[in-house]
Amino acid sequence: MTLPKTSFAMVLTGPRTFAPMDLPLPEIDDDSALLRVEACGICGSDVEQYEGVLRTPVPVVPGHEPLGTIAKIGDRAARRLGVDVGDRVAVETILA
C-alpha cells in the first residue's frame, strides 16, 4: 500500500484555538512505526492543554491514547512488539 505524503489533523495552535492542517508524515526507522489513527482518547490533560492551563509547546495535536492500524513499521519494532502492518493496536501512552 502506498502511503500519502501528508496527514490531515486539527492542530491546537493556542488556547481554545484549532486550525486544520496537512502535516507531513514522518519517516520511520527500524525501531519505530507509523499508526493510522482511527480513534483517540481525550483526557483531563488534553482539556487543560486546550484551555491553556497546561503550558505545552504549540502547535500540537491533542490526544495521547490512540487506537489504529499499523501503516508502516520497522523490522526491529515489529519483532520487539510482535505486530505487523495491518494489525489494529491500542498504544499505551508510556510507549508513545
Regions from the language model: what does each represent?
Residues 16-24:
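Short glycine/threonine/proline-enriched tight-turn/helix- or strand-capping micro-motif at secondary-structure
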Residues 43:
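Short cysteine clusters
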